[in-house]
């Protein structure tokens, strides 16, 4: 998606100017996850045909941009995008308007929102529309509703998700897996508040350089902020007592809730929200420990993505360098950047460069993952930071008794757990691996006469912490099987009189695979192993065939 965004933004600007020429009043253009949007004042009606006519109008070769606004014929149109710039080299000619709807940025305002895409060639447009049709079939928002995983409610607030029991089960499994990964690397888990005085954001630099994302309020004469990041809190834990060179590295982890005020037009299901949980981690270490730590993080990150079935070709690291707005000296930035480059080179991974896309306090390695639809998602990050230890005056006593500054490394493997849930739902098309599925087995008694045996099978699985449920014979067997498939249940156990008398089950798995006369204890043993190993494939049914 990211590679399309520059041409989409240019297309949105072109269309906005053409709409002005037609007498309409666009007020903003921006980018969504899969398209561009234009907000138009709704004091005059606008139809799809009128928008299509405006597409073909001539447009100025060089669009006048001032202070991130299109300035044209007395109109000022805000550009709601700070990561993609307007390119004079792009010339989109092929447009598709995806929909026109009413948009309410607040209760007192109403706009017409036009969503569309633009490309330089007709072939690119056709290919994208074909891909989009497939993507819409696996939209995580539809899957989430269908499987009863999560919901959004305007009365609760835009971009604030409510996870239902089945959705929370998936999150819990992801967190449990990451806890094991963290334990294997020597992390100590911490918990920090959701709200802090803004003093720490002023020290860290977030208050100035991250101000548009901060949610702040005043209480009893003090200014507080809902945390957008966990790092300053972890720094304060480090500072809570003296540290020596023998203590380092110190590794803190937290499944921390953070909140960032994303623009309403950019919110998109779980992929772009205002409140989410990070699998965050911060390491405080000596400079001589830095290289090995980064190499370990790179290795563990790749190991995690392999566990979810992503191959080496689906994993692409990038080095993101110093942005225009940053803190710290050139010397510190160069030192941090060189450390990341050296670790990447020693890892043997091929990596790209993203100029000026580092964090404001340090360079970083970002990992992008390619899903089953060919999309690349930025997930994991490893950031080297010499600046925040300096700003917070962090210290440790070296072996020679001298106080020195530690280096700080920020890291997250999933990134946002909520966003990762969305990516997994779309990647697996709602059919999650057994260990992640909110319901792992559904028992289907053929008739009420075998309910007692079906319930014994159910209870035996639940005693072994398998997430199982039963669907009694209220509907036909074929209908109940279809319901289980549609709801992404990995395994279906069918039991009738024969199975009840022999202590067996008929096992059905995804792909319409069926295995009869399976001893229930044998199935249970194999399933426990599949779940414990967190297999991506359904290894239980493979072993039974």
UniProtKB/Swiss-Prot annotation:
Required cofactor names: Zn(2+)
Top-rank taxon, per record: Archaea
Chain spans, region Catalytic: 139-433
Main location: cytoplasm
Gene3D superfamilies membership: Anticodon-binding domain, Bira Bifunctional Protein, Domain 2
Compartments it resides in: Cytoplasm
Substrates-to-products reaction catalysed: tRNA(Thr) + L-threonine + ATP = L-threonyl-tRNA(Thr) + AMP + diphosphate + H(+)
Cofactor, free-text remark: Binds 1 zinc ion per subunit.
EC number: 6.1.1.3
SUPFAM superfamilies: Class II aaRS ABD-related, Class II aaRS and biotin synthetases, ThrRS/AlaRS common domain
Cross-referenced PROSITE patterns: AA_TRNA_LIGASE_II
GO biological-process terms attached to the record: threonyl-tRNA aminoacylation
HAMAP family named among the record's database cross-references: Thr_tRNA_synth
Biological role: Catalyzes the attachment of threonine to tRNA(Thr) in a two-step reaction: L-threonine is first activated by ATP to form Thr-AMP and then transferred to the acceptor end of tRNA(Thr). Also activates L-serine and transfers it to tRNA(Thr) but cannot deacylate incorrectly charged amino acid; unlike most archaea the editing function is found in a freestanding protein.
Family of this protein: Belongs to the class-II aminoacyl-tRNA synthetase family.
Protein name in UniProt: Threonine--tRNA ligase catalytic subunit
Organism: Saccharolobus islandicus (strain M.16.4 / Kamchatka #3)
Phylogenetic classification of the source organism: Archaea, Thermoproteota, Thermoprotei, Sulfolobales, Sulfolobaceae
